[in-house]
Regions:
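Outer-membrane beta-barrel translocator domains and adjoining extracellular loop/strand segments
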Residues: 3-12, 34, 63-71, 76-78, ...
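Hydrophobic, lipid-facing positions within transmembrane beta-strands of outer-membrane proteins
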Residues: 34-40, 79, 89-93, 145-149, ...
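Residue-level signature of outer-membrane beta-barrel architecture
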Residues: 28, 32, 42-43, 56, ...
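Transmembrane beta-barrel strands of outer-membrane/channel proteins
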Residues: 1, 52-56, 74, 95, ...
Length: 237
């Protein structure tokens, strides 16, 4: 590719202050971030143990969801002078115990995640055909927490597992929901899964899967207005 690309520089008030041009082979933006990890395990006895872990992850491409004309769509943004990479610090701990000579496994795990540099479109963002779309983004923070329960049977003709997860994912971003904490698009609190397998013969088996998930959060519009013949939807909180 031998063409040129341009980039709009946005200030802290989300106004365009400059336009930068880049040629083929020219470095656009560079960032370096460490991603440390730590995992610990303590064996209580032959049947039970506890585990704890910490990890930091960095995401160099983020997605923001918007709705134009009532249709939702996602926009991916690479890091740039306007958009910092998203960082996540995750803490997790769990208790694990086996029964009946390790034929049945059980576990309880809890986790907490702290997000920084989370991007999202501001309320009533102008996204359709907007070449200055970076100015419609806002950057904030987020948090996620949950508990996971699991029972698994690995031995015998009848095997399978049952799991339940309760989790929340929340964000706080300026100019969205009046600056108050709100549910992220990934906030689906309940997840319940049942997987059952039965072996009739070495060559014949049957399986049943059942999954229940909480639906994604939705914001319903409460009004609309028209400017120059174009109708815009006003979203609720």
């Amino acid at each position: 590719y031998s063409g040129k690309e341009y980039f709009y520089v946005v200030d802290e008030n989300h106004n365009v202050t400059d336009t930068l041009h880049y040629g083929a082979g020219q470095i656009f933006h560079t960032e370096i971030h460490p991603e440390p990890r730590l995992a610990l395990m303590y064996r209580i006895d032959e049947k039970s143990s506890v585990k704890a872990s910490y990890s930091r992850t960095v995401q160099y491409a983020q997605v923001a969801s918007a709705a134009t004309g009532g249709l939702p769509f996602d926009v991916w943004f690479p890091i740039s002078p306007n958009i910092k990479p998203q960082t996540c610090d995750q803490f997790a701990a769990g208790y694990f115990r086996n029964f009946k000579d390790n034929a049945i496994e059980t576990s309880v795990e809890v986790y907490y995640k702290n997000f920084k540099n989370v991007i999202d479109f501001k309320d009533n963002a102008m996204t359709y055909g907007n070449v200055l779309i970076d100015g419609e983004l806002r950057c904030g923070k987020g948090r996620s927490y949950g508990v996971e329960l699991l029972v698994r049977k690995n031995v015998g003709k009848f095997t399978g597992w049952i799991s339940y997860t309760y989790s929340r994912t929340l964000r706080t971003v300026p100019d969205i929901n009046f600056g108050k904490e709100y549910r992220s698009p990934y906030d689906r609190p309940h997840n319940f899964v049942i997987v059952l397998n039965y072996d009739f013969t070495p060559r014949l088996s049957a399986a049943v899967n059942w999954i229940y998930n909480t639906g994604q959060p939705v914001t319903f519009p409460y009004g609309q207005y028209t400017i120059d013949g174009v109708t815009y939807v006003v979203q609720g909180s």
